[in-house]
């Protein structure tokens, strides 16, 4: 599944700047930030990336979520995110507090907008799901990175 998605992205002309297929919940591929508009054209129905800029650059990424796993109940201090379900269906829990709400199911083509600091959790359902995401950095002097994560709860003890 992971290599097929990677090859698919390359066939679209995307440059993959990093990847990690060893996460307990699945994995991700990071796309060259200079291709943010092309990424949006392919995965976000051509949404103008200039309308997404909050305080800095944009970082496109693909998440591949294994079936029947939950990512951390988490939030970010230096980014907001916009997601588009690309393949399959996925569960998502969202809240403005540490208390988890009910899971909502999103299908291919559905878009989700997460605010900076909003708690969220992706949940794999019956099959793999692929979610395109764009990080909307909120601090241009200190852009978000993989360390910008506050885990409120994590099934994997991280």
Ranges and model annotations:
Residues 1-58, 149-158:
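A short, N-terminal "cap"/entry segment at the start of jelly-roll beta-barrel domains
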Residues 79, 91, 98-100, 129, ...:
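Short, surface-exposed beta-strand-loop junctions and turns on beta-sheet-rich folds
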């Amino acid at each position: 599944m992971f290599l097929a998605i990677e090859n698919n992205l390359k066939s679209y002309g995307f440059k993959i700047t990093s990847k990690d297929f060893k996460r307990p919940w699945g994995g991700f591929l990071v796309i060259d930030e200079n291709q943010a508009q092309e990424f949006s054209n392919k995965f976000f129905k051509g949404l103008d990336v200039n309308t997404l800029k909050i305080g800095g650059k944009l970082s496109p990424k693909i998440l591949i979520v294994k079936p029947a796993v939950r990512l951390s109940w988490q939030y970010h201090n230096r980014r907001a995110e916009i997601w588009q379900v690309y393949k399959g269906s996925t569960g998502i829990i969202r809240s403005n507090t540490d208390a988890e709400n009910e899971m909502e199911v999103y299908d291919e083509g559905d878009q989700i907008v997460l605010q900076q600091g909003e708690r969220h959790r992706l949940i794999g359902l019956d099959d793999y799901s692929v979610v395109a995401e764009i990080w909307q950095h909120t601090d241009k002097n200190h852009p978000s990175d993989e360390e910008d994560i506050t885990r409120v709860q994590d099934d994997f003890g991280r």
